[in-house]
Amino acid sequence: MHYLDNASTTRVTRSAANAALDAMLNRFGNPSSVHSLGIEAEGIISRARKELADALGCKPQEIYFTSGGTEADNLAVIQGAELQKRKGRHIITTSIEHPAVINAMKYLASNGFEVTFLSPEKDGTVSLEAFEQSVRRDTVLVSMMLCNNETGAFQPVAEAVRLFREKNPDGLFHTDAVQAFMKQRFDVRSLGVDLLSVSSHKIHGPKGAGALYVRGGVKMKPLLHGGNQESGLRSGTEAVPAIAGFGEAVREARADLQNNMEKIDRLRGRLIAGLARLPKVELIAVGSAIITLAVPKYPTEVIIRLLESRNIFVSGGSACSRGKSSHVLEAMKVQPNLIKSSVRVSLSWHNTDEDIDALLLALEEIA
């Protein structure tokens, strides 16, 4: 099998799976319980929290576990806006965000907030000049993803934060870092953000776990009310097995981050060089670990099925927008015929040269 859909989800590593299984079978206490099994479960969460904090360059108490990236995004955007609404009701985001952010913004727009959606340039990045011109005195929240989930384009988040602070030092800045986490080096201090979302299943951890970084001093209100878990921000008994696997996946990836980044760079270079020899395949966008291409001869779903018949797995864009035309490529003003024939190839450090070569051979055969 040649799995090249790692921006949708990743195969869980043996080590992360074992950590989750151990938590399910042997350390199954409720982390809120005061007996030894509960204390042991709480210890698993604390260790995972520290792994994430070390990876993001923050304090453990600034990490809050969620059910995934979508919940983390919603918590940041909706509750961030609610926290700031007495200061203003203007929000800035981009038109190429993940649906978790786009739809949270639409919800806020229907509840009295004014949302500015910035369109990207042809390379998929947002103009800093356009961003700066959009910032107003009543702009209380910005959400700009760090790495796009369809094109792999990195947004100038740190620079945007600086421009935002110059005009509105009390506003909140959120970034969805789900696709960037453990694929590029960054930390919350150098980015300067107040809120940052990550997800377990995009880094070879189990599904059902994510995390939100909340800068110390930012007093977020919860979306869920109950037993006051996660310091009151996210009630509900924590999914200890998923969190255990998440923490182990972070530990593994962080331990070999430089080699992993170099491997992805090499695989991407191999793919780009091979695509240059295929004139009937159009290259739409190239990111650090994501390549978007088109085979104009076929619609997207047919390309996916033809590749699947050769045991190669890719996607047609965001797995969370199945069956819909790519709002990201539309915002980039990609030709409609290419959008209808586009597929996304997303790499992991677990991919091999054989995966790339199999894809290139298959594209040559079907193009």
Describe these PLM feature segments:
Residues 1-367:
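Pyridoxal 5′-phosphate
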